[in-house]
A protein has these predicted regions:
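Contiguous beta-strand/loop segments that form the cofactor/metal-binding neighborhood of enzyme cores
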Residues: 195-274, 299-311
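Predominantly a Rossmann-like dinucleotide-binding segment in NAD(P)-dependent oxidoreductases
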Residues: 139-217, 337
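Rossmann-fold dehydrogenase core element
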Residues: 121-138, 159-163
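N-terminal Rossmann-like dinucleotide-binding module
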Residues: 1-61
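C-terminal helix-rich "cap/oligomerization" subdomain common to oxidoreductases
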Residues: 1, 29, 82-84, 304-344
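Active-site loop of classical SDR/Rossmann-like NAD(P)-dependent oxidoreductases
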Residues: 288-300, 315
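Hydrophobic residues in well-ordered beta-strands that form the structural core
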Residues: 108, 133-135, 240, 267
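Beta-loop-alpha module in the N-terminal Rossmann-like domain of NAD(P)-dependent dehydrogenases
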Residues: 19, 62-125
Length: 344
């Protein structure tokens, strides 16, 4: 039997805990170390909750792994092959830099970095490294979004005329999310998912026009954006809305509506993961999707990439970096109430 890849996870918030659960389901890897600056997360006496059912269901209680209060100590463990970085966004760059310097493969949670300047530095590090690195933009692997991308690219229902994405919830609370300088507000921490998928699916927009307002993070916590593609009759109308200013008890809304020449797709996250197709002359149809969440599929893809000997897909990584440039343009658009061109 071939040697298993050894994984170390830095950060045991909702995403780190979710990743921990997922690795236990994947052949060829095993988690041998975890790190968090909060002792109670390491010993299992506390854990973070996620937005979506199925996130962070397991835990560290009874887990036989090395535990570190400092993520840099985990990176210096010579037995570790993969470093999974799930710390605060403002810390992504320093941990990615350190892990690549130690020749570790790196999976880094979204967004790739706190700023586009930091993201560009990560791209340069990746270009020089023999290690693999992936930005964990989970919508690229989420079954309903995979289905949508294929429907657009293959014109399954004819030309795509319009796309609208929504991602809304109540304020998550806590010190990290209360500090825009760390998290980037809902604009960067939450809304980035939809901006990235638009970039991934349709390519870099030419410009954006955004409106929004500040919230409990001290930064932009509710945003509505129109993405402008200067391709006459070639690109759909594209918009998205992201917010964590909803009142307590609202829940989590993750949805999209895609209108095509010959059909309308409507997705709303729920227990059944239902994607509805509406067409003239037909009864609405529920489309059965592949079971599972994007988190699992992205991690499986990363592990497979390493085990197969493939190198980092720099195009996909660069796309994740440019997503941050789009988000920063959205921020400027809100502040100036103007259309802002994307500069990369």
């Amino acid at each position: 039997m071939s040697k298993k890849l050894k994984v170390g996870i830095i950060g045991l918030g909702s995403m780190g805990s979710t990743h921990l659960d997922i690795y236990s389901k994947i052949d060829g890897v095993e988690v041998i170390a975890i790190a968090d600056s909060i002792q109670s997360r390491l010993d299992g006496s506390s854990k973070a909750e996620g937005n979506i059912s199925g996130q962070a269901e397991g835990g560290v209680s009874g887990l036989s792994v090395k535990k570190y209060l400092n993520g840099m100590d985990l990176i210096n463990n010579s037995d570790i092959d993969i470093v999974d970085i799930c710390v605060g966004t403002d810390l992504h760059y320093i941990f990615v830099e350190a892990a690549l310097a130690r020749n570790k493969h790196v999976l880094v949670e979204k967004p790739l970095a706190r700023t586009y300047d930091e993201a560009k530095k990560i791209i340069k590090l990746a270009e020089k490294s023999s290690s693999n690195i992936m930005s964990a933009m989970c919508l690229r692997y989420w079954p309903a979004w995979v289905f949508l991308k294929e429907a657009i690219e293959k014109s399954i229902y004819g030309k795509c005329l319009s796309l609208n994405f929504r991602r809304q919830t109540s304020f998550p609370g806590g010190a990290f999310y209360s500090d825009d300088s760390q998290c980037g507000g809902a604009l960067l921490d939450l809304h980035v998912h939809d901006t990235d998928f638009i970039n991934f699916c349709l390519g870099l927009p030419d410009a954006v026009f955004s409106q929004g307002y500040n919230g409990p993070s001290g930064g932009i916590d509710h945003v509505v954006t129109n993405y402008i593609f200067n391709k006459t009759n070639a690109s759909p109308l594209v918009s998205s809305e992201g917010s964590w200013t909803m009142q307590e008890g609202y829940g989590f809304n993750m949805s999209y509506t895609a209108n095509f020449e010959n059909g309308t797709l409507s997705y709303l996250l729920d227990e059944e993961e239902t994607l509805k197709l509406c067409r003239y002359g037909y009864e609405p149809e529920n489309i059965k999707l592949k079971e599972g969440m994007g988190y699992e599929f992205e991690i499986r893809a990363f592990v497979d990439e390493i085990l197969s000997g493939n190198k980092t897909n720099l195009d996909l990584l660069s796309q994740a970096a440019k997503t941050i440039a789009i988000v920063e343009a959205e921020k400027i658009s809100i502040e100036t109430c103007s259309v802002v061109a994307i500069q990369t």
